């Protein structure tokens, strides 16, 4: 089994980290730079920075904020939100992002995936996919614009398409699970990871320490993203990693990791 990654996520709007349930009812969590520094100290493997209102407001993720965060952390930083061109990608990479993430713009212009992968390499290109269950059919469907717009795209088919276009990684969020803290949609991630040959990050639903081992041991995901459980300090990253090691899940470990907040 490959080494698994624990990845906190900063959902940022108006320069502040926010968190809600099912993509709504956002509450203020704090300053992005301070929170990023805390996760650096706790031993996060990567950090995801998503400007969650950039697309709806017709703007790019704040480059200055990305630069400020990148100066504080020494782990891979993935940035998404409002990216519409290769110039936007270049600006974020120059500001300190290690990877860029497309979501709504990838659906609007799939060729943007190929263009970004050709210019910057598929290793630094992530496609984020927000997935919600259709109550009528039970199918997993793709939504964009912060989960507000249905696309009519079936999730597995879209995942296969973006990989074929050059995406080097998938960040897949279960909208049904987002912020609920009742566990990842492990069955879906098992199906998804069997269908694609790139790393997949699971997102949405982490609430208790067992949830991380469950998704790693019962699906092929290589990373588990979480927000609420870390932001509100119900668990630390070090506590999660200690539990994973006990359960036979390989993770990066450093004896100096902070167990507290």
From Swiss-Prot:
GO cellular component: cytoplasm
Primary location class: cytoplasm
GO molecular function: imidazoleglycerol-phosphate synthase activity; lyase activity
Subcellular localization, as worded in the UniProt entry: Cytoplasm
An individual GO BP term: L-histidine biosynthetic process
Top-level enzyme category: lyase
Keywords: Amino-acid biosynthesis, Cytoplasm, Histidine biosynthesis, Lyase
InterPro entries: Aldolase_TIM (IPR013785), His_biosynth (IPR006062), HisF (IPR004651), IGPS_HisA/HisF (IPR050064), RibuloseP-bd_barrel (IPR011060)
Active site positions, chain numbering: 11, 130
Protein's pathway: Amino-acid biosynthesis; L-histidine biosynthesis; L-histidine from 5-phospho-alpha-D-ribose 1-diphosphate: step 5/9
EC number: 4.3.2.10
Catalyzed reactions per annotation: 5-[(5-phospho-1-deoxy-D-ribulos-1-ylimino)methylamino]-1-(5-phospho-beta-D-ribosyl)imidazole-4-carboxamide + L-glutamine = D-erythro-1-(imidazol-4-yl)glycerol 3-phosphate + 5-amino-1-(5-phospho-beta-D-ribosyl)imidazole-4-carboxamide + L-glutamate + H(+)
Signal peptide, first to last residue: none
Subunit structure: Heterodimer of HisH and HisF.
Family: Belongs to the HisA/HisF family.
Job description of the protein: IGPS catalyzes the conversion of PRFAR and glutamine to IGP, AICAR and glutamate. The HisF subunit catalyzes the cyclization activity that produces IGP and AICAR from PRFAR using the ammonia provided by the HisH subunit.
Record-given protein name: Imidazole glycerol phosphate synthase subunit HisF
Gene that this sequence comes from: hisF
């Amino acid at each position: 089994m490959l080494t698994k990654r624990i990845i906190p996520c900063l959902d940022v709007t108006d320069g502040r980290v926010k968190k809600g349930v099912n993509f709504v009812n956002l509450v203020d969590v704090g300053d992005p730079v301070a929170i990023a520094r805390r996760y650096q100290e706790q031993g996060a493997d990567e950090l995801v920075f998503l400007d969650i209102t950039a697309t709806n407001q017709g703007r790019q993720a704040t480059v200055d904020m990305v630069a400020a965060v990148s100066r504080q952390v020494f782990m891979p930083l993935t940035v998404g939100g409002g990216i519409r061109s290769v110039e936007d990608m270049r600006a974020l990479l120059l500001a300190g992002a290690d990877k860029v993430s497309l979501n709504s713009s990838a659906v609007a212009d799939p060729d943007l995936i190929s263009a970004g992968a050709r210019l910057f390499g598929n290793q630094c290109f992530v496609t984020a996919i927000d997935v919600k269950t259709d109550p009528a059919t039970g199918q997993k469907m793709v939504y964009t614009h912060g989960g507000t717009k249905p696309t009519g795209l079936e999730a597995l088919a879209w995942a296969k398409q973006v990989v074929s276009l050059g995406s080097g990684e998938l960040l897949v969020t279960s909208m049904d699970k987002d912020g609920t803290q009742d566990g990842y949609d492990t069955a879906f991630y098992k199906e998804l990871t069997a269908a694609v040959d790139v790393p997949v990050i699971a997102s949405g639903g982490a609430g208790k320490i067992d949830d991380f081992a469950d998704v790693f041991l019962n699906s092929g995901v290589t990373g588990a993203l979480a927000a609420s459980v870390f932001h509100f300090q119900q668990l630390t990253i070090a506590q999660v990693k200690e539990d994973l090691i006990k359960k036979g899940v390989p993770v990066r470990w450093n004896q100096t990791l902070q167990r507290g907040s």
